[in-house]
């Protein structure tokens, strides 16, 4: 082998390693995931299956990918709640859907609702869930402060009837209103 051939091979090898490293750096490897069964809440007639939300680890945080149907069109508050329960409970003498889930998950004691990337807000605050006119939701949302599946195991996913302004004003907890659908994260 002559010197020119050796030099060409060496340059080619170095370039190949550089391209491989650049490609590896720009991809998002799919990590571990959990599939959560979601039900529309009805404390009187019983809950009804509406699909799943798959939670996946990524380099940028947890990704929540819904595969839901039969929901009302529009933006809906979407949160991680404290307890692994979607059961109804009584509040002020009235059976309330999903109350067994507790409040928004707030392990750091922020005591305020906010944006999913806001450090001084509930850790369970997620981007709003978009439901299309046909009642389906398939658009993933990213929770950048949540990094590992173990962060959310033993809690629940909650979808509220109304949207979410990511503030406690003018209405508390983003104004999402009643609990519409729920799933326990196992």
Curated annotation (Swiss-Prot):
Disulfide bonds join 86-182. Its main location: periplasm. It catalyses: 2 superoxide + 2 H(+) = H2O2 + O2. It is found in: Periplasm. Its cofactor is Cu cation; Zn(2+). Binds 1 copper ion per subunit. Binds 1 zinc ion per subunit. GO terms for cellular component: periplasmic space. GO terms for biological process: removal of superoxide radicals. Its EC number is 1.15.1.1. SUPFAM superfamilies: Cu,Zn superoxide dismutase-like. Keywords: Antioxidant, Copper, Disulfide bond, Metal-binding, Oxidoreductase, Periplasm, Signal, Zinc. InterPro entries: SOD-like_Cu/Zn_dom_sf (IPR036423), SOD_Cu/Zn_/chaperone (IPR024134), SOD_Cu/Zn_BS (IPR018152), SOD_Cu_Zn_dom (IPR001424). PROSITE patterns: SOD_CU_ZN_1 (PS00087), SOD_CU_ZN_2 (PS00332). Zn(2+) binds at residues 104, 113, 122, 125. Residues 1-22 form the signal peptide. It comes from the Bacteria. Belongs to the Cu-Zn superoxide dismutase family. Destroys radicals which are normally produced within the cells and which are toxic to biological systems. Homodimer. This is Superoxide dismutase [Cu-Zn]. It comes from Neisseria meningitidis serogroup B (strain ATCC BAA-335 / MC58). The lineage of its organism: Bacteria, Pseudomonadati, Pseudomonadota, Betaproteobacteria, Neisseriales. The gene is sodC.
């Amino acid at each position: 082998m002559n010197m020119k051939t050796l030099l060409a091979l060496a340059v080619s090898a170095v370039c190949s390693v550089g391209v491989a490293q650049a490609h590896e750096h720009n991809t998002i490897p799919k990590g571990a995931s959990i599939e959560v069964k979601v039900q529309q809440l009805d404390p009187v007639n019983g809950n009804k299956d509406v699909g799943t939300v798959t939670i996946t680890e990524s380099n940028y945080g947890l990704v929540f990918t819904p595969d839901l149907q039969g929901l009302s069109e529009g933006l809906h508050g979407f949160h991680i709640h404290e307890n692994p329960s979607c059961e109804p409970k009584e509040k002020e003498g009235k059976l309330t859907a999903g109350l067994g889930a507790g409040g928004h998950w707030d392990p750091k004691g922020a005591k305020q609702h906010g944006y999913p990337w806001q450090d001084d807000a509930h850790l369970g605050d997620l981007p709003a869930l978009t439901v299309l006119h046909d009642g389906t939701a398939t658009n993933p949302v990213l929770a950048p402060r949540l990094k590992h599946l173990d962060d959310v195991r033993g809690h629940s996913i909650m979808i509220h009837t109304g949207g979410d302004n990511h503030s406690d004003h003018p209405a508390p907890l983003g104004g999402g209103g009643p609990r519409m659908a729920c799933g326990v994260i196992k």
